[in-house]
């Protein structure tokens, strides 16, 4: 977290709620439970949703992909409920899954009462929790960007135009999404995401007095992050030397980092990053590929920021 203010205050999220709705839809899509070209039949209940909508009719059929577009671009309440019913049988059952997922993500300030964000007693979350679900969505389901970055589009073969409620998509460099919301009681909210130079930031603004103000505040937060922080790739200070293997078909094994390491640091602090390599001595065959041989400890100005396992890059059999 680069900056926060009243981040744990429980407030109404309005349609920013739909980030969780989208997360559950994307999880179902990416796990193969449903497909983008599945056709969904709209119920009378879904068609009767008030607020922002795409005027779905009872019995109308629309693909999962089109409904996703309706939810991300124009925040269609009717589309959100149609998808909730398609996935879970009823909105109530879907909301139970939303709350379960919120618990799993550590969203302690959150209670969902519906999948749309329409005003309801006890339907609350915090800026902190919105950031958590936003991160989960963009990190693990990057294809959501295909929808959240749409500025203008249409459905029903061009008969119904869609323009994104998120102005940043059109007017902020690197904007990738994510979701706006507004009601009379929640006022104006947004979870805004943007990426520059491989670094993606999330800015959450709640209870802003005007629509323009929420975008200005989100822009200021993102600008602050991009101006002051950078993502630094970390490599070992010295090359990883081969490790001796006793009784092996080869005398050595080459160690490698198990994963890449990137650290978020203040600009100008890149020089304060250092690494310490801890490697096993006297390794005895057999050695499995991927077997842990040690670790690289990464510090910034003496403070440990990450520990990356070091593993064997190949298998070494035992001499027979």
For the regions a protein language model found, what residue spans apply to each?
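Active-site-adjacent loops and short helices of periplasmic peptidoglycan-processing enzymes
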Residues: 1-141
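Domain-terminus/edge residues, biased toward the C-terminal soluble/receptor-binding domains
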Residues: 107-111, 119-124, 128-320
